[in-house]
Amino acid sequence: MAATAASSLQIATRRPSMSSPSKILKAGTYIVGANPGNASWDKLSCTRQLSNLGCLRNHSAVPTCKRPFSFSTRAMSESSENKAPSGLPIDLRGKRAFIAGIADDNGYGWAIAKSLAAAGAEILVGTWVPALNIFETSLRRGKFDQSRVLPDGSLMEIKKVYALDAVFDNPEDVPEDVKTNKRYAGSSNWTVQEAAECVKKDFGSIDILVHSLANGPEVSKPLLETSRKGYLAAISASSYSFVSLLRHFLPIMNPGGASISLTYIASERIIPGYGGGMSSAKAALESDTRVLAYEAGRKSNIRVNTISAGPLGSRAAKAIGFIDTMIEYSYNNGPIQKTLTADEVGNAAAFLASPLASAITGATIYVDNGLNAMGVALDSPVFKDLNSKN
C-alpha cells in the first residue's frame, strides 16, 4: 500500500518490516507518508491458510458460525533496523475492526481495512449478500493479493467474512420476495442483528466499527423527479443503516472504541446529478453522527465520526455516472492540486480509530484535498487571470 499523505505518524504492525524504499524504523513500525512506490518484494515468503467460511450458509434461526475464512501470510526480511521509533505511533495491535460494505478491492472500505490492518488491527468484513460469492471467490483465488500488500510487504489478513444486508435490522424485517430471491439463496444470518450476534459468538467483542455503505436506486434522477420509495430507500441504505449497525454492535464494542462512516460534500453543497435523495441521506448521516457521538459516548465511551471523502473512481461510484468529471473538477479546483487516493482516506480512518484521536468525536473530517473550503471554481474562465498568476 502506498501511503501518500505526508505525515510523521507511524503505523505499528504485527509483522516484521522489510527492506524497501519505505522508511523502516523498527520491526513492526511504518511511517505514514513513506512511499514504497516500486518496491519489490521478491523475497517475500507467504503461507496462505484458508479455512471454511462461517456463519454464511447456516439456515437455523440461531446463528451457528463455522471456522473463519482467513488469509494470512508470513513475511521474512533479510534485515531490519533496530532504531527507536520517533514521532507518534498509530498502534492498533490487539484491536478488532468490523468493516461493513466491502465487496471489492478498489473502494474506500477496502483502503480503510488495509490501513487498520497495517496498524495492527484484526479485520472482519461484512459483504452485501448478492456480492458475497464473487468476493469470496476472488479472495480464494488470489485476485486481490496485489492490493492486499501492506507496507511491510505482508498481505492484509481478513480474519472472517460475514454476509450482511444492512437494510434489514432483523429476520422479521425481511420481506418474502427477498427471502426467495435467488441472489440470497444459500445465505443466512445476514441481517444486522444476526451479523452482530455472529461476531459476538465468534470473537466476543470489537473495538472499531466502520460503515462503508451507500445506495440510492434513483441516484441519477433530480430530486423533483425522485419517488418517495426511491428517496426512502436511499435514506435506509445510506444513513439509517449506520444507526442500525451502531445500535446492534454497540453492546459488543469495548469502551474507548471508535465508529466511523463515510459521507460526501453533497450533504451541504449542491452537486447536480447526485440525486435520488442521496444528498439528503448524507446530510442525515452527518447529523446522526453528532447525535450518536453523544449517545454512544455517554452510554459506552465510544467515539463516532464521519469522513467526508472526495470523489474516487471506484466501481460503486461509477453508478453515479459522472464520477470521472467530479474527479477532474476536484483536481482542477482544490487547494492541493493532486488526485485523491483511497489510501489517504484509509490513513485518516486509522488515525480516527486510534488513541491519538481520543478527544475527537461527533466530527465530520474532510479528506478531499481541501475542495470543501473552496467558494469558487478556479477552472472557470472568470478566474483565468488568477490561475495564470498562480
Swiss-Prot record:
Q: Which parts of the sequence bind NADP(+)?
A: 53, 170, 282, 314
Question: What is this enzyme's EC?
Answer: 1.3.1.9
Variant or mutagenesis effect after changing residue 226 to I: Loss of activity
- This protein is called Enoyl-[acyl-carrier-protein] reductase [NADH], chloroplastic
Q: What residue range does the UniProt record give for the transit peptide?
A: 1-74
Q: What does this protein do?
A: Catalyzes the NAD-dependent reduction of a carbon-carbon double bond in an enoyl moiety that is covalently linked to an acyl carrier protein (ACP). Catalyzes the last reduction step in the de novo synthesis cycle of fatty acids. Involved in the elongation cycle of fatty acids which are used in lipid metabolism. Required for normal plant growth.
One GO term in the molecular function aspect is:
enoyl-[acyl-carrier-protein] reductase (NADH) activity
User: What gene does this protein come from?
Assistant: MOD1
